[in-house]
Amino acid sequence: MKFNTKTIHGGQKIDPAFNSVMQPIYQTSTYAQESPGVNKGFEYSRTHNPTRTALQNAFASLENAKYGVAFSSGLAAIDAIIKLLKPGDEVVSTNDLYGLSLINI
């Protein structure tokens, strides 16, 4: 698949719920569970949802990677990156970051 086509269709799968060709945007916050702690892959949108899964698959496809990662907020992404750092590592950023990001860095 060429890059221009991949940017539109990369990582897409037919939505199993209703066989839609384009990924729907799931705006629900919670998902029904079969029993406590037993779900069909999703329980709460902030941690994981079908829309984010589709976005992560698209990112992975564009980068020819096995996995892609998306976060529910910019601060969550910054926190994940900071947790990968080791003592002595340096961070290069702009001085125009969200206030709490500056405190954490």
Predicted regions and their residues:
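Hydrophobic alpha-helical segments typical of transmembrane helices
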Residues: 54-55, 77
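Conserved PLP-anchoring active-site segment centered on the Schiff-base-forming lysine
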Residues: 84-101
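N-terminal "arm"/small-domain region of PLP-dependent enzymes with the aminotransferase-like
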Residues: 1-49, 55-57
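Structural motif
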Residues: 24-25, 67-69, 89-90
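Fold-independent oxyanion-binding glycine-rich loops
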Residues: 11, 29-30, 73-74, 94-96
